[in-house]
């Protein structure tokens, strides 16, 4: 079997199948192939791998920065980033997904306002770094996520992604939904 990424469940057919996809690596054209999979054929459903497990396939030029990020996370609130995107696909498949200009796509789950504040402090030194550039999603209550750079910019409305779809939400409402 091959790893696949699951799309939003709302696109599934009557709960019997799930819409998935697989991105091809750059040498194979970076095509994104959609696949409809019967749930009975799914062997396992896994969370994105933690960054610490994916370091072995990260480019040498990223190593010091990513190790420093892990150390900063350990001294912050202990939130460990999960890896998605090209780094995750390279780790999962052993194929060359990373390019010279790839970002490190990470997801941090936060369960409280304090954790959100600490995460922003931990990530602040990486706001302008490019070794690699961090593309961070902050996973809030439920399965909703916002882009860290957008959150950090402080707009009153934010783009929120979830398994149900994409919407604009008021920042104050998002904060109300995060435990104090």
Predicted regions and their residues:
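Extended catalytic-interface subdomain
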Residues: 178-180
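Residue-level recognition of well-ordered beta-strand positions that form the cores
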Residues: 21-23, 107-109, 137
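Active-site nucleotide-donor binding segment shared across nucleotidyl transfer reactions
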Residues: 70-104, 108-114, 123
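Conserved catalytic core of two-metal-ion nucleotidyltransferases
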Residues: 126-162
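Broad gene-expression machinery/nucleic-acid interaction feature
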Residues: 17-19, 101, 105, 133-135
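Helical scaffold of the NTase/Pol beta-like nucleotidyltransferase catalytic core
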Residues: 1-86, 124-132
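Mature, function-bearing regions of proteins
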Residues: 39, 43, 157-172
């Amino acid at each position: 079997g091959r790893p696949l990424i699951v799309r939003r469940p709302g696109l599934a057919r009557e709960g019997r199948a799930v819409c998935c996809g697989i991105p091809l690596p750059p040498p194979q054209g970076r095509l994104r192939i959609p696949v409809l999979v019967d749930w009975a054929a799914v062997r396992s459903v896994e969370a994105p791998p933690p960054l610490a497990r994916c370091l072995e396939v990260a480019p040498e030029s990223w190593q010091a920065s990513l190790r420093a990020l892990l150390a900063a996370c350990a001294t912050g609130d202990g939130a460990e980033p999960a890896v998605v995107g090209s780094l995750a696909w390279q780790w999962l498949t052993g194929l060359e997904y990373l390019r010279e200009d790839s970002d490190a796509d990470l997801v941090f789950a936060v369960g409280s306002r304090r954790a959100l504040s600490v995460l922003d402090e931990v990530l602040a030194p990486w706001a302008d770094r490019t070794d690699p550039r961090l593309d961070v999603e902050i996973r809030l209550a439920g399965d909703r996520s916002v882009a860290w750079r957008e959150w950090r910019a402080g707009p009153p409305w934010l783009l929120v992604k979830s398994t149900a779809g994409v919407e604009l939400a008021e920042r104050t409402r998002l904060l109300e939904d995060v435990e104090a």
